[in-house]
Protein backbone atom coordinates (compact mmCIF):
# COMPACT_ATOMS: atom_id res chain seq x y z
CA UNK A 1 0.00 0.00 0.00
CA UNK A 2 2.96 2.36 0.49
CA UNK A 3 3.77 2.17 -3.24
CA UNK A 4 0.13 2.82 -4.15
CA UNK A 5 0.09 5.81 -1.81
CA UNK A 6 3.26 7.27 -3.37
CA UNK A 7 1.74 7.03 -6.85
CA UNK A 8 -1.65 8.46 -5.88
CA UNK A 9 -0.02 11.25 -3.89
CA UNK A 10 2.02 12.24 -6.93
CA UNK A 11 -0.77 12.18 -9.50
CA UNK A 12 -3.87 13.03 -7.45
CA UNK A 13 -3.66 13.59 -3.72
CA UNK A 14 -0.88 16.19 -3.49
CA UNK A 15 -3.00 18.63 -5.47
CA UNK A 16 -6.17 17.75 -3.55
CA UNK A 17 -4.57 18.39 -0.16
CA UNK A 18 -2.85 21.55 -1.43
CA UNK A 19 -6.27 22.87 -2.49
CA UNK A 20 -8.20 21.82 0.60
CA UNK A 21 -5.50 22.49 3.22
CA UNK A 22 -2.99 24.93 1.74
CA UNK A 23 -0.16 26.18 3.86
CA UNK A 24 3.04 24.54 2.75
CA UNK A 25 5.43 25.61 0.04
CA UNK A 26 5.00 24.67 -3.60
CA UNK A 27 8.18 23.10 -4.90
CA UNK A 28 9.80 22.27 -8.17
CA UNK A 29 12.89 20.83 -6.52
CA UNK A 30 12.77 17.27 -7.73
CA UNK A 31 15.65 16.29 -5.46
CA UNK A 32 12.94 15.87 -2.86
CA UNK A 33 11.88 12.73 -4.73
CA UNK A 34 14.44 10.88 -2.61
CA UNK A 35 12.40 11.73 0.48
CA UNK A 36 8.88 11.78 -0.94
CA UNK A 37 8.75 8.78 -3.27
CA UNK A 38 11.07 6.33 -1.56
CA UNK A 39 8.70 3.36 -1.82
CA UNK A 40 7.78 3.63 -5.49
CA UNK A 41 11.34 4.75 -6.17
CA UNK A 42 12.54 1.21 -5.57
CA UNK A 43 10.60 0.23 -8.70
CA UNK A 44 10.64 3.40 -10.79
CA UNK A 45 12.20 6.88 -10.29
CA UNK A 46 8.97 8.86 -10.00
CA UNK A 47 9.41 12.60 -9.51
CA UNK A 48 7.09 14.31 -7.00
CA UNK A 49 4.43 16.72 -8.15
CA UNK A 50 4.78 20.47 -7.86
CA UNK A 51 2.20 20.36 -5.03
CA UNK A 52 4.11 17.74 -3.01
CA UNK A 53 4.87 20.14 -0.14
CA UNK A 54 2.09 22.69 -0.71
CA UNK A 55 -0.27 21.48 2.01
CA UNK A 56 -0.27 21.84 5.80
CA UNK A 57 -0.73 18.08 5.86
CA UNK A 58 2.60 16.62 4.79
CA UNK A 59 2.73 13.25 3.14
CA UNK A 60 3.95 11.46 6.25
CA UNK A 61 1.46 13.11 8.61
CA UNK A 62 -0.67 10.45 10.28
CA UNK A 63 -4.04 12.23 9.69
CA UNK A 64 -3.28 12.63 5.98
CA UNK A 65 -2.17 9.04 5.57
CA UNK A 66 -5.23 7.77 7.42
CA UNK A 67 -7.57 9.93 5.34
CA UNK A 68 -5.94 8.86 2.07
CA UNK A 69 -6.04 5.18 3.00
CA UNK A 70 -9.68 5.46 4.03
CA UNK A 71 -10.78 6.81 0.66
CA UNK A 72 -8.52 4.45 -1.29
CA UNK A 73 -9.92 1.44 0.57
CA UNK A 74 -13.50 2.70 0.33
CA UNK A 75 -13.40 3.46 -3.40
CA UNK A 76 -11.43 0.32 -4.23
CA UNK A 77 -13.94 -1.79 -2.30
CA UNK A 78 -16.87 -0.17 -4.09
CA UNK A 79 -15.24 -0.66 -7.49
CA UNK A 80 -14.45 -4.34 -6.99
CA UNK A 81 -17.87 -4.95 -5.42
CA UNK A 82 -19.89 -3.40 -8.23
CA UNK A 83 -17.72 -4.64 -11.09
CA UNK A 84 -17.48 -8.19 -9.78
CA UNK A 85 -21.08 -8.47 -8.61
CA UNK A 86 -22.49 -7.02 -11.82
CA UNK A 87 -20.43 -9.32 -14.04
CA UNK A 88 -21.32 -12.45 -12.07
CA UNK A 89 -24.97 -11.43 -11.75
CA UNK A 90 -25.43 -10.87 -15.49
CA UNK A 91 -23.41 -13.88 -16.65
CA UNK A 92 -23.51 -16.84 -14.26
CA UNK A 93 -26.25 -16.15 -11.75
CA UNK A 94 -29.43 -18.10 -12.54
CA UNK A 95 -32.24 -15.57 -13.07
CA UNK A 96 -34.88 -18.22 -12.37
CA UNK A 97 -33.96 -17.77 -8.70
CA UNK A 98 -35.69 -14.39 -8.82
CA UNK A 99 -38.93 -16.39 -8.59
CA UNK A 100 -37.76 -18.53 -5.69
CA UNK A 101 -40.21 -18.27 -2.75
CA UNK A 102 -37.35 -17.40 -0.40
CA UNK A 103 -36.11 -14.59 -2.63
CA UNK A 104 -37.12 -11.33 -0.97
CA UNK A 105 -39.03 -8.52 -2.62
CA UNK A 106 -36.55 -5.95 -3.99
CA UNK A 107 -33.73 -8.14 -2.67
CA UNK A 108 -31.03 -6.93 -5.07
CA UNK A 109 -31.71 -3.32 -4.10
CA UNK A 110 -31.68 -4.24 -0.41
CA UNK A 111 -28.38 -6.11 -0.79
CA UNK A 112 -26.77 -3.12 -2.52
CA UNK A 113 -28.08 -0.70 0.11
CA UNK A 114 -26.64 -2.84 2.91
CA UNK A 115 -23.30 -3.09 1.11
CA UNK A 116 -23.15 0.68 0.55
CA UNK A 117 -23.68 1.13 4.28
CA UNK A 118 -21.11 -1.48 5.30
CA UNK A 119 -18.18 -0.84 2.95
CA UNK A 120 -17.15 2.62 4.28
CA UNK A 121 -17.36 1.44 7.90
CA UNK A 122 -15.23 -1.60 7.08
CA UNK A 123 -12.78 0.74 5.36
CA UNK A 124 -12.49 2.84 8.53
CA UNK A 125 -11.84 -0.27 10.62
CA UNK A 126 -9.23 -1.52 8.14
CA UNK A 127 -7.19 1.71 7.99
CA UNK A 128 -5.11 0.90 11.14
CA UNK A 129 -3.74 -2.21 9.43
CA UNK A 130 -2.74 -0.29 6.32
CA UNK A 131 -1.17 2.43 8.47
CA UNK A 132 0.89 -0.22 10.23
CA UNK A 133 2.00 -1.58 6.86
CA UNK A 134 3.13 1.72 5.34
CA UNK A 135 4.96 2.60 8.56
CA UNK A 136 7.03 -0.55 8.37
CA UNK A 137 5.37 -2.70 11.01
CA UNK A 138 4.60 -5.60 8.69
CA UNK A 139 6.73 -8.25 6.99
CA UNK A 140 5.87 -7.13 3.47
CA UNK A 141 8.83 -7.06 1.09
CA UNK A 142 9.39 -5.56 -2.36
CA UNK A 143 11.33 -7.96 -4.53
CA UNK A 144 11.54 -11.72 -4.99
CA UNK A 145 15.21 -11.55 -4.05
CA UNK A 146 14.19 -10.41 -0.56
CA UNK A 147 12.16 -13.56 0.16
CA UNK A 148 13.36 -15.85 2.99
CA UNK A 149 14.36 -18.40 0.32
CA UNK A 150 13.66 -18.58 -3.44
CA UNK A 151 10.84 -21.14 -3.27
CA UNK A 152 8.98 -18.94 -0.79
CA UNK A 153 7.88 -16.68 -3.64
CA UNK A 154 5.65 -19.55 -4.75
CA UNK A 155 4.87 -20.95 -1.31
CA UNK A 156 3.48 -17.62 -0.07
CA UNK A 157 0.28 -18.14 -2.07
CA UNK A 158 -0.83 -21.51 -0.64
CA UNK A 159 0.41 -20.43 2.80
CA UNK A 160 -1.73 -17.29 2.64
CA UNK A 161 -4.78 -19.27 1.52
CA UNK A 162 -4.24 -21.92 4.22
CA UNK A 163 -3.81 -19.33 6.99
CA UNK A 164 -6.79 -17.20 5.98
CA UNK A 165 -9.02 -20.20 5.30
CA UNK A 166 -8.35 -21.46 8.82
CA UNK A 167 -8.89 -18.07 10.44
CA UNK A 168 -12.09 -17.30 8.57
CA UNK A 169 -13.54 -20.73 9.33
CA UNK A 170 -13.21 -20.27 13.09
CA UNK A 171 -14.30 -16.63 13.05
CA UNK A 172 -17.31 -17.46 10.88
CA UNK A 173 -18.23 -20.43 13.04
CA UNK A 174 -17.92 -18.31 16.19
CA UNK A 175 -20.30 -15.78 14.65
CA UNK A 176 -22.96 -18.48 14.58
CA UNK A 177 -22.79 -18.86 18.36
CA UNK A 178 -26.14 -17.84 19.88
CA UNK A 179 -24.50 -15.13 21.99
CA UNK A 180 -23.35 -13.14 18.95
CA UNK A 181 -25.29 -14.44 15.95
CA UNK A 182 -28.36 -12.24 16.35
CA UNK A 183 -26.55 -8.90 16.57
CA UNK A 184 -23.49 -9.66 14.42
CA UNK A 185 -24.11 -12.21 11.66
CA UNK A 186 -27.86 -12.62 11.29
CA UNK A 187 -28.12 -9.68 8.89
CA UNK A 188 -26.11 -11.57 6.27
CA UNK A 189 -28.39 -14.59 6.54
CA UNK A 190 -31.34 -12.44 5.62
CA UNK A 191 -30.41 -13.43 2.07
CA UNK A 192 -31.45 -17.11 1.99
CA UNK A 193 -31.05 -17.21 -1.78
CA UNK A 194 -28.17 -14.76 -2.24
CA UNK A 195 -27.14 -12.93 -5.37
CA UNK A 196 -23.54 -11.77 -5.97
CA UNK A 197 -24.62 -8.40 -4.54
CA UNK A 198 -25.02 -10.12 -1.15
CA UNK A 199 -21.25 -10.61 -0.94
CA UNK A 200 -20.79 -7.40 1.09
CA UNK A 201 -24.34 -7.11 2.39
CA UNK A 202 -23.66 -7.73 6.07
CA UNK A 203 -23.06 -6.02 9.36
CA UNK A 204 -19.82 -4.06 8.85
CA UNK A 205 -18.35 -5.53 12.05
CA UNK A 206 -19.10 -8.98 10.65
CA UNK A 207 -17.31 -8.24 7.39
CA UNK A 208 -14.36 -6.67 9.18
CA UNK A 209 -14.02 -9.61 11.58
CA UNK A 210 -13.91 -12.10 8.71
CA UNK A 211 -11.29 -9.98 6.92
CA UNK A 212 -8.91 -9.97 9.90
CA UNK A 213 -6.86 -13.00 8.76
CA UNK A 214 -6.01 -11.21 5.51
CA UNK A 215 -4.43 -8.33 7.39
CA UNK A 216 -2.89 -10.35 10.22
CA UNK A 217 -1.00 -12.62 7.84
CA UNK A 218 1.55 -10.01 6.60
CA UNK A 219 2.11 -8.92 10.19
CA UNK A 220 3.26 -12.44 11.06
CA UNK A 221 4.69 -13.85 7.83
CA UNK A 222 6.67 -12.46 4.87
CA UNK A 223 4.59 -11.52 1.84
CA UNK A 224 5.68 -9.79 -1.35
CA UNK A 225 3.87 -6.48 -1.91
CA UNK A 226 2.72 -7.26 -5.44
CA UNK A 227 1.41 -10.64 -4.28
CA UNK A 228 -0.41 -8.91 -1.42
CA UNK A 229 -2.25 -6.55 -3.76
CA UNK A 230 -3.08 -9.40 -6.12
CA UNK A 231 -4.36 -11.56 -3.27
CA UNK A 232 -6.42 -8.63 -1.98
CA UNK A 233 -8.19 -8.43 -5.34
CA UNK A 234 -8.54 -12.21 -5.46
CA UNK A 235 -10.15 -12.60 -2.03
CA UNK A 236 -12.57 -9.75 -2.79
CA UNK A 237 -13.67 -11.33 -6.07
CA UNK A 238 -13.82 -14.77 -4.41
CA UNK A 239 -16.23 -13.37 -1.83
CA UNK A 240 -18.43 -12.21 -4.70
CA UNK A 241 -18.10 -15.50 -6.56
CA UNK A 242 -19.19 -17.76 -3.70
CA UNK A 243 -22.44 -15.80 -3.51
CA UNK A 244 -23.21 -16.66 -7.11
CA UNK A 245 -25.70 -19.30 -5.87
CA UNK A 246 -24.89 -21.59 -8.77
CA UNK A 247 -23.01 -24.84 -8.97
CA UNK A 248 -19.87 -24.12 -10.98
CA UNK A 249 -17.94 -26.97 -9.40
CA UNK A 250 -18.70 -30.20 -7.56
CA UNK A 251 -15.22 -30.22 -6.05
CA UNK A 252 -14.90 -32.00 -2.74
CA UNK A 253 -11.98 -29.70 -1.87
CA UNK A 254 -12.94 -26.21 -3.04
CA UNK A 255 -15.54 -24.32 -1.02
CA UNK A 256 -17.25 -22.67 -3.97
CA UNK A 257 -20.73 -21.25 -4.68
CA UNK A 258 -22.35 -24.64 -4.14
CA UNK A 259 -21.01 -25.00 -0.59
CA UNK A 260 -21.72 -21.41 0.37
CA UNK A 261 -25.26 -21.48 -1.00
CA UNK A 262 -25.93 -24.50 1.22
CA UNK A 263 -24.57 -22.45 4.13
CA UNK A 264 -27.11 -19.71 3.44
CA UNK A 265 -29.92 -22.24 3.19
CA UNK A 266 -29.07 -24.43 6.19
CA UNK A 267 -26.92 -22.05 8.32
CA UNK A 268 -24.84 -24.52 10.33
CA UNK A 269 -22.72 -26.03 7.57
CA UNK A 270 -19.86 -25.01 5.26
CA UNK A 271 -18.28 -22.16 7.20
CA UNK A 272 -15.06 -22.28 5.17
CA UNK A 273 -13.98 -19.66 2.66
CA UNK A 274 -11.69 -21.36 0.15
CA UNK A 275 -11.59 -25.07 0.99
CA UNK A 276 -13.68 -27.69 2.76
CA UNK A 277 -10.75 -28.82 4.94
CA UNK A 278 -11.79 -27.17 8.20
CA UNK A 279 -15.45 -28.04 7.70
CA UNK A 280 -14.43 -31.68 7.41
CA UNK A 281 -12.19 -31.42 10.48
CA UNK A 282 -14.88 -29.59 12.45
CA UNK A 283 -17.74 -31.85 11.37
CA UNK A 284 -19.64 -29.05 9.61
CA UNK A 285 -19.20 -30.11 5.99
CA UNK A 286 -22.36 -30.69 3.99
CA UNK A 287 -22.17 -31.96 0.44
CA UNK A 288 -24.94 -31.17 -1.99
CA UNK A 289 -27.10 -34.09 -3.02
CA UNK A 290 -27.33 -34.82 -6.70
CA UNK A 291 -30.77 -33.23 -6.92
CA UNK A 292 -30.35 -30.58 -4.24
CA UNK A 293 -29.87 -27.61 -6.52
CA UNK A 294 -32.81 -28.69 -8.65
CA UNK A 295 -34.88 -28.70 -5.48
CA UNK A 296 -33.53 -25.32 -4.43
CA UNK A 297 -34.43 -23.79 -7.78
CA UNK A 298 -37.87 -25.36 -7.92
CA UNK A 299 -39.05 -24.72 -4.36
Residue ranges and their predicted role:
Residues 148-169, 173, 229, 235-239:
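Membrane-embedded alpha-helical segments that form the functional core of polytopic membrane enzymes
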Residues 9, 72-84, 117-133, 159-161, ...:
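Hydrophobic alpha-helical transmembrane segments of multi-pass integral membrane proteins
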Residues 32, 36, 60-122:
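Alpha-helical transmembrane segments in multi-pass membrane proteins
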Residues 112, 172, 185:
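Conserved hydrophobic/aromatic pocket- or pore-lining residues that grip, position, or stack substrates
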Residues 1-63, 67, 93-104, 175-299:
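Cytosolic/stromal cytosol-facing helical appendages immediately following the last transmembrane segment
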Residues 67-71, 75, 116, 154-158, ...:
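Hydrophobic alpha-helical transmembrane segments
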Residues 100, 105, 109, 124-163:
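Juxtamembrane helix-loop-helix connectors linking adjacent transmembrane helices
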Residues 84-93, 126-134, 138, 168-176, ...:
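Membrane-water interface at transmembrane helix exits
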Amino acid sequence: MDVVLDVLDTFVLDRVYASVLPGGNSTSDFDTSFFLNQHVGRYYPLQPSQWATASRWKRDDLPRQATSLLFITWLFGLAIYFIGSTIFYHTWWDKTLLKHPRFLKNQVRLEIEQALFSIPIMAILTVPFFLAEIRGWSKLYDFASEAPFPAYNWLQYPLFVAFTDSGIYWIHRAEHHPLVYRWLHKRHHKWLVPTPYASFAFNPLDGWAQSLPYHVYPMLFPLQKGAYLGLFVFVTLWTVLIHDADCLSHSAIINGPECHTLHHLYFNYNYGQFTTFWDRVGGTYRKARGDEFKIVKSQ
